[in-house]
């Protein structure tokens, strides 16, 4: 009787052991795939990015001086979803992607300043005060940064509305969180941050105020270029003698993306579609005003969600920064800039592709199914199938 009980216990033990082994294998595979796709893949992608090299020696006559280099990151169109649009899973997935991408970039690349070129939120143009507060809280969690790293944000049409939707309340609400700063100088470099939604030129109150601010900035920049102590400039502190970098959401006027190229440019079928002024790009008049007032050496913009490089007047380069979110692009990226008071160099850093991550997950699911069926004996292994075929041939 005792022998029968021992045999019965052994008979139950082996299936239990097989099930435990299967469960451990499944957990190990799931953990490994999640670890790679949700954490390690960002390190693998961003580790390949390097700060571009820039000349750091400036010459004033025959004297040479060493210029400091500012390491700046430029990203655009994060479009954090609000309470109305987008499925909760869509919101969770895309916001996690952006959070991991930024936190990994901050840790690996150690930038000194991060600029976001508008459309931080997707529903800022109509969100309630409660929804706005929730969106801001999520943004601050996702885009947290060390105290020595500065974060600068310009307004986009999804943050404060298109021109016909924009009002003082929305603008002040945005500027209360992200500052109303128009001119930012660091390491001898001037950055001008423009509310391009307010550059409609129709004389609206917000537009007139924005233009007046830019005229004042233009005056200060001109004073920095003139001889020190000029009567026209007054006794106030002068800006560094450096042509500014213009940062805004809308691109300066261009007819279309027909001359844009690259993996992250607009799809070929969309490149020849004409742009609408004050909707897709700034108007000709507003663009000419900005170029005349500010005389920038470099322009960076967002809005189109795709990359493009154009030259205005044959001398002022503008780079449209692609969207940072998987929701707008399969291959998001950001721009890295090494900038000095007299020179700059830019390079692009690509984030993991969403389709690659999905393929890895699909492959993992297929592997788990095969592994489970194999353990349950419902799927013969290739080795056993080969042995059976050999036996059949020998018997013939």
From Swiss-Prot:
Its main location: endoplasmic reticulum. Its cofactor is Mn(2+). It is found in: Endoplasmic reticulum-Golgi intermediate compartment membrane. A divalent metal cation 1 binds at residues 119, 157, 249, 303. Belongs to the metallophosphoesterase superfamily. MPPE1 family. Interacts with GPI-anchor proteins (via the GPI portion). Interacts with TMED10. Metallophosphoesterase that catalyzes the removal of a side-chain ethanolamine-phosphate (EtNP) from the second mannose of the GPI-anchor protein intermediate. Participates in the glycan remodeling steps of GPI-anchor maturation to allow an efficient transport of GPI-anchor proteins from the endoplasmic reticulum to the Golgi. This is Metallophosphoesterase 1. It comes from Macaca fascicularis. The lineage of its organism: Eukaryota, Metazoa, Chordata, Craniata, Vertebrata. The gene is MPPE1.
